[in-house]
């Protein structure tokens, strides 16, 4: 079991056979060492008790019922007066049955077996370290090829004959022609290695530091050569350089973590605790078993068959032994990752077996569903919706969720302010939803951040802190700019809300996890709080007013109306028809009074800034007044000038949407400038 005070993290990696043996073996009081599972049986069909040395053996994994052995005898657990702490007849200790949740066993494999995760998963770690093609290694593991194993200090057949100096070669049709059956078996056992044992020998001979040095030298040589002019050769060199970098990183990782490469070849196969692969009796007396039990049984059956072939019958043909070794390798592959080599193994009902990989990976796997996704106190969950009026560091919490999360704080506030005499009265006031409850809840929430999390939490921005505010409804309101960090959108996504309780957690939430303090991606440094999806659509709608100016062309398809007979107004009429505003506040006020639409063109008086006028642009029309003043009308602006050609006013042709967008950007820039001035 994992002690939460001693172990702050959980890491999955390779372990040595000695470590597996230390985990799985135990010494019972009579001095006997148990832990090896040798029989493929589970429960006896008559007594319904676990078989000895089987997959549910009580000697190996502990008693099914606390303090009761396989014989039915009972002892008080932890009673020092009891002389015997185990049953001498069946060998079962009188201990707590919870040991069956973490006590492991092991299967001693007759032949080494390659761990399929490190062979078949991409990138293949074994292929990277050995610098061999994956297909050749697969042929070697599954006994399709062989590996020449010369013995030092002795002249061998493979050394004397130059035609057999290849490291990996097919011998099925060449070497047997020179030997009798018995002579070839002796020669093969001495000279040829195949299966996972051949891979293990090569991995054991590796020096990781020499691999790093040689890979670095080759990488530098490839970098000095430069482009060859042949595109295919250049791509080949780039792929080789990338491979060398991955190989060096892998070797450094093995050195840093004190892992030996040969540990990727299994000699001892761990057996999971029985409670993690249970057999359950349902209605009608039928039994339901975990698929892993059937896969373990298959491994034990084939391993015992191989043991019998090697021990009981010395005249067994080598081909039969190699075939059985291949079956053991395939059985272990199916146990670890069913279907990784092609068609998955199925049961009698054509249902695919769930292997160990299927149990732990995915949304319904052991980690995400049981360990990461389990329910905790002071947490809630709801659908997220957009809250465009919220600040970047705020989120909207529904009243129903907020009162449950902060109920203890509200109770304390009611009692401190003498509004409730005890906890029971305070809870009754909360159930009745009195107005004073919401006032105290508002006070509590002002100084207490909350954490929002969206699964899967793939990086640190998957959980951020926010300042909560009360909102109506039953959904969590979120600012759309923070969605990219969560990889969320508003099509029904759900998020979990957590309340940090300790002062350390609250300080971390305020200083490190607030959303407005995580504007850059921690991986590449690019801005992560950028408009996406709904915000881009909103900005498009906001600024999608007419950009064609005041000129109308009956042959321009953009100007065509739904009715072909509708009259296209003249330039003068459009100019006089569109309203004029002195400032943006008047224009927005007219929009709120529904006198104009969001995309209706209008004329807005602008500051006397000549930069908006193109130097070569000429007016479309010029209108003169009786006093000598005149209006120069352009496509997107007009200028009011005096008789002396002095500029009185400049009006730009825009829409309410453009005005709103400009004001938001202006306020953001001013706020940023003020913040920078405060910092300096």
Swiss-Prot record:
Mg(2+) binds at residues 489, 491, 493. It is an enzyme of class 2 (transferase). Signal peptide: none annotated. GO terms for molecular function: DNA binding; DNA-directed RNA polymerase activity; magnesium ion binding; zinc ion binding. Keywords: Chloroplast, DNA-directed RNA polymerase, Magnesium, Metal-binding, Nucleotidyltransferase, Plastid, Transcription, Transferase, Zinc. GO terms for cellular component: chloroplast; DNA-directed RNA polymerase complex; mitochondrion. It comes from the Eukaryota. Its EC number is 2.7.7.6. Its main location: plastid. Zn(2+) binds at residues 69, 71, 87, 90. Binds 1 Mg(2+) ion per subunit. Binds 1 Zn(2+) ion per subunit. The keyword Zinc applies. InterPro entries: DNA-dir_RpoC_beta_prime, RNA_pol_asu, RNA_pol_N, RNA_pol_Rpb1_1, RNA_pol_Rpb1_3_sf, RNA_pol_Rpb1_clamp_domain, RNApol_RpoC1. In plastids the minimal PEP RNA polymerase catalytic core is composed of four subunits: alpha, beta, beta', and beta''. When a (nuclear-encoded) sigma factor is associated with the core the holoenzyme is formed, which can initiate transcription. DNA-dependent RNA polymerase catalyzes the transcription of DNA into RNA using the four ribonucleoside triphosphates as substrates. HAMAP family: RNApol_bact_RpoC1. This is DNA-directed RNA polymerase subunit beta'. It comes from Arabis hirsuta. The lineage of its organism: Eukaryota, Viridiplantae, Streptophyta, Embryophyta, Tracheophyta.
């Amino acid at each position: 079991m994992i002690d939460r005070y001693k172990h702050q993290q959980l890491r999955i990696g390779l372990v040595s056979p000695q470590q597996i043996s230390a985990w799985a073996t135990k010494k019972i009081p009579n001095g006997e060492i148990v832990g090896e599972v040798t029989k493929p049986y589970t429960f006896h069909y008559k007594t319904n008790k676990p078989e000895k040395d089987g997959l549910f053996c009580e000697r190996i994994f502990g008693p099914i019922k606390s303090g009761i052995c396989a014989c039915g005898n009972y002892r008080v657990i932890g009673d020092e007066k009891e002389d015997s702490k185990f049953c001498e007849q069946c060998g079962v200790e009188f201990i707590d049955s919870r040991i069956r949740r973490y006590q492991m066993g092991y299967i001693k494999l007759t032949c080494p077996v390659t761990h399929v995760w490190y062979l078949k998963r991409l990138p293949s770690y074994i292929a990277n370290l050995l610098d061999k093609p994956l297909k050749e290694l697969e042929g070697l593991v599954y006994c399709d090829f062989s590996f020449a194993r010369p013995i030092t200090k002795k002249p061998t057949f493979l050394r004397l004959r130059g035609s057999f100096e290849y490291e990996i070669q097919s011998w099925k049709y060449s070497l047997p022609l020179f030997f009798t059956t018995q002579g070839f078996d002796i020669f093969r056992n001495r000279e040829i290695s195949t299966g996972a044992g051949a891979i293990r020998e090569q991995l054991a001979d590796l020096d990781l530091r020499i691999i790093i040095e040689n890979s670095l030298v080759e990488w530098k040589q490839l970098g000095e050569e430069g482009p060859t002019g042949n595109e295919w050769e250049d791509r080949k060199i780039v792929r080789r350089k990338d491979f060398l970098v991955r190989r060096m990183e892998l070797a450094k990782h093995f050195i840093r973590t004190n892992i030996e490469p040969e540990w990727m070849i299994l000699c001892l196969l761990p057996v999971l605790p029985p409670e993690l692969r249970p057999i359950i009796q349902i209605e009608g007396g039928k039994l339901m078993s975990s698929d892993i039990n059937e896969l373990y049984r298959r491994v034990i059956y084939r391993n015992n068959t191989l043991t019998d072939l090697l021990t009981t019958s010395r005249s067994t043909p080598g081909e039969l032994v190699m075939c059985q070794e291949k079956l053991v390798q395939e059985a272990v592959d199916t146990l670890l990752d069913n279907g990784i080599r092609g068609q998955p193994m199925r049961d009698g009902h054509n249902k695919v077996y769930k292997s160990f990989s299927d149990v732990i990976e995915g949304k319904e796997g052991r980690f995400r569903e049981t360990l990461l996704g389990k329910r905790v106190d002071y947490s809630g969950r709801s659908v997220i919706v957009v809250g465009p009026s919220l600040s970047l560091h705020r989120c909207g919490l529904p009243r129903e969720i907020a009162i449950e999360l902060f109920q203890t704080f509200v109770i304390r506030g009611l009692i401190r302010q003498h509004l409730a005499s005890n906890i029971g009265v305070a809870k009754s006031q909360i159930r009745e939803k009195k107005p004073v409850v919401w006032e105290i809840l508002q006070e509590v929430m002002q100084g207490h951040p909350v954490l929002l999390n969206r699964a899967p939490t793939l990086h640190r921005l998957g959980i951020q802190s926010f300042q909560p505010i009360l909102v109506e409804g039953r959904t969590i309101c979120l600012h759309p700019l923070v969605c990219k960090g969560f990889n969320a959108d508003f099509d029904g996504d759900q998020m979990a809300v957590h309340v940090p309780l300790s002062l350390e957690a609250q300080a971390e939430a305020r200083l490190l996890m607030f959303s407005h303090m995580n504007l850059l991606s921690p991986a590449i440094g690019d801005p992560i709080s950028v408009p996406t999806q709904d915000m881009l659509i909103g900005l498009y709608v906001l600024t999608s007013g007419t950009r064609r100016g005041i000129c109308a062309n009956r042959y321009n398809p953009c100007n065509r109306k739904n009715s072909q007979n509708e009259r296209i107004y003249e330039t003068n009429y459009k100019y006089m028809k569109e309203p004029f505003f002195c400032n943006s506040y008047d224009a927005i006020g007219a929009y709120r009074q529904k006198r104009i639409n969001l995309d209706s063109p209008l004329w807005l008086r602008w500051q006397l800034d000549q930069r908006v006028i193109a130097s070569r642009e000429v007016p479309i029309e010029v209108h003169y007044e009786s006093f000598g003043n005149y209006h120069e009308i352009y496509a997107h602006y007009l200028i009011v000038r005096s008789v002396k050609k002095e500029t009185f006013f400049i009006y730009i042709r825009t829409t309410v949407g453009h005005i709103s967008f400009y004001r938001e950007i202006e306020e953001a820039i001013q706020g940023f400038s003020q913040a920078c001035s405060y910092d300096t």
